[in-house]
């Protein structure tokens, strides 16, 4: 098993996960019952852990870390915009993302009031 040595920025980013979970909770609480919300957040936690692995291995030191930047990045989408070729050439992509993961991310964007049609990963990547 590979041991991950996180930088200070990455450690701070991991702590900021709570901000995202709290934000998701605020937006979903009024729309879903407690059971559905709990199940949704459990699935989201699994997906989000996968996202961090992908992000760390792909971007390393460039990971965003402050609360302000974190919130801004969240509002603008989870990932930096990349071209389709850049996305498909990532060695981690096939391991990290499944179609279910993609749909869950898309649903999170909808619940957070983001434009789901402007998501940089499109359905065509999964066809």
Swiss-Prot record:
The lineage of its organism: Eukaryota, Viridiplantae, Chlorophyta, core chlorophytes, Trebouxiophyceae. It comes from the Eukaryota. Keywords: Cell cycle, Cell division, Chloroplast, Plastid. Belongs to the MinE family. This is Putative cell division topological specificity factor. Prevents the cell division inhibition by proteins minC and minD at internal division sites while permitting inhibition at polar sites. Its main location: plastid. The keyword Cell cycle applies. GO terms for cellular component: chloroplast. One of its GO terms (biological process) is cell division. It is found in: Plastid, Chloroplast. Coiled coil: none annotated.
């Amino acid at each position: 098993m590979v041991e991950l040595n996180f930088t200070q920025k990455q450690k701070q980013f991991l702590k900021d996960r709570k901000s995202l979970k709290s934000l998701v909770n605020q937006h979903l609480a009024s729309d879903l019952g407690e059971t559905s919300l709990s199940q949704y957040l459990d699935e989201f936690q699994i997906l989000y852990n996968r996202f961090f692995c992908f992000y760390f291995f792909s971007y390393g030191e460039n990971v965003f870390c402050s609360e302000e930047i974190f919130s801004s990045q969240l509002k603008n989408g989870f990932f930096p915009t990349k071209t389709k070729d850049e996305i498909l050439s990532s060695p981690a992509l096939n391991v990290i993302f499944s179609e279910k993961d993609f749909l869950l991310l898309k649903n999170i964007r909808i619940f957070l009031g983001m434009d789901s049609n402007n998501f940089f990963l499109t359905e065509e990547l999964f066809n």
